[in-house]
Amino acid sequence: MEAHKPVLFDEVMEGLAIRPDGIYVDGTFGRGGHSFGILQRLGPNGRLMAMDKDPDAVAVANKALFEDARFSIVHETFANLQKAVRDRGWEGKVNGILLDIGVSSPQLEDAKRGFSFSKDGPLDMRMNPKQSMDAASWINQAAMEDIRRVLWNYGEERFAKRIAQAIVNAREEKPITRTQELSDIVIKAYPQREIKKHPATRTFQAIRIFINRELDELRECLPQCLETLAVGGRLCVISFHSLEDRLVKRFIQKESRDHLPREIPILAKDIKHRLKPLGSLIRPTEAEIKKNPRARSARLRIVEKLS
């Protein structure tokens, strides 16, 4: 299988500390770059299970790796990771898990998927097209306050109220069904003095995260990773914006710090921490950013399970 070299590839491979006979999970197959790297480092007795809720990604995996007995792909969100691991009898035996959060480059580049404000296409944004609600159906029926809340909570968009009002005004004229239409609405609503990057960036991010339950699924997945890992197993999480990274950071802090009240008479050495952070936050090198500008906002956190 030929695969593109994904973001922070070398750092992830080092962070997973891959054992030739180990069991690994790639929770976000995408186009297989990380999975391919793991398989290259596994021996004949090693195993890799990949997951992806995008049927296009599953089709790529089945075509490229169907002959590799060490590999299996599950068409499922990583929010159901523990069940998929349990079905294989691997619970508590997994040596490494990778989560590469967010939208993939192929999804962004395919105008028909509706993720990009720079390519006109149907306003869809579903990672799993079998999911019932797409971006257009939501944006044309949601209350203005609900739109404002989504733009603020998931995009940290300062002008959420203005944009939400502009969306409601525009859809009264005709339904919003194309990515270009939504992008134009946001551009017109944005104060010109504030334009430093494309005005629709945060709006598209927020709607995509909401439609696909991205933060909810990450929140559900992280405790499952802890339960499925073997002691000494590694978890690597790549995030691309502060909302995701904040969620991951708080989970790691909760499972790795002393968080009992000071008045409780227990010594720190007697508290069993479940996770140990390995190093600090990892960012891509300037050389990687030059080759792949999308890598600029990537952040990698690596932890090891202690108990």
From Swiss-Prot:
Annotated keywords: Cytoplasm, Methyltransferase, rRNA processing, S-adenosyl-L-methionine, Transferase
Catalytic activities: cytidine(1402) in 16S rRNA + S-adenosyl-L-methionine = N(4)-methylcytidine(1402) in 16S rRNA + S-adenosyl-L-homocysteine + H(+)
Known role: Specifically methylates the N4 position of cytidine in position 1402 (C1402) of 16S rRNA.
A GO CC term attached to the entry: cytoplasm
A Pfam family matched in the record: Methyltransf_5
GO annotation (BP), single: rRNA base methylation
GO MF entries: rRNA (cytosine-N4-)-methyltransferase activity
UniProt KW rRNA processing keyword: yes
Localization annotation: Cytoplasm
Top-rank taxon: Bacteria
Organism of derivation: Coxiella burnetii (strain RSA 493 / Nine Mile phase I)
Family: Belongs to the methyltransferase superfamily. RsmH family.
EC identifiers of the protein: 2.1.1.199
Membrane-spanning parts: none
Binding annotation for S-adenosyl-L-methionine: G32, G33, H34, D52, F78, D100, Q107
InterPro entries: RsmH, SAM-dep_MeTrfase_MraW_recog, SAM-dependent_MTases_sf
Protein name: Ribosomal RNA small subunit methyltransferase H
Keyword Transferase (UniProt): yes
NCBIfam families: 16S rRNA (cytosine(1402)-N(4))-methyltransferase RsmH
Gene label: rsmH
